[in-house]
Amino acid sequence: FYTFQMISYGADVYRGTIRAERNLLNLGLYMSFFPKMIQGPIERYQGMGACIRNRHVTPELFACGARRFIYGLGKKVILANQFGSVVDKVLANPMDQISGGLGWYVGILYTLQIYFDFSGYSDMAVGLGKMLGFELTENFNYPYLARTVGEFWRRWHISLSGWFKDYLYIPLGGSRRGTLITCRNLMIVFLCTGFWHGAGLSFIAWGMYYG
C-alpha cells in the first residue's frame, strides 16, 4: 500500500495532476497515515491532501466513525475469524478424507472469510479516518452481488482496481488499440493483481484465469 501510494503521488506530480507538496509534514502524514497502512485503502494525494489541509472533527463525525469501526471489528472478529476457524479445522485433514459436499461447504466459508476479513479491516480504516477527520475511500460495494466478472471487480477492492486502471491499464493503451492489445493489457493487469495478492504460483494462475 505504501509503495503504491508513492508511485501514484510521483506519477500524478509528473503528469501535472497535482502540485508537489512542499510541506514535508503533510506529505509524511499522507504516506504513513496509520489506519490505511495494513489493508488500505490506497489513497491518492489529490483527495487526501485536501483532507489534510482542511481537516476538521465534529462530535457527529467522530460518532459516525466509531460506529463504522465497531461494525468492521465485528465483521472481522465475529464472522471472518469464526469462518476461518472452521476452514482451518477441515483443511487440517488429509484431502482424500474431505468429501465433495464438505469441500463445497469449506469453499463457500473461505470465500466469506476473505470478504469479511478484508472488508472488515477496510471498515475499521474508514471509521478511524472519520474519527480523526479524514474521509477515506470506500473499498467494497457488496461485490458478491455482482452479476458479471467486470462488475465484481468494480465492487471488490475498489482502490486497488482503480490504481491498476489509472497507472497500468490506461498507460498501456487501455482499450483504444484494438481487441488483441486490449486483451494483452487486461492479462498484464490481472497478472500483476495476482502477484500483488501473493508471489505463489496459485496467485499467478488466479490472475491469468481472470485475465
Describe the role of every protein-language-model region.
Residues 1-211:
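Membrane-embedded transmembrane alpha-helical bundles that form the catalytic cores
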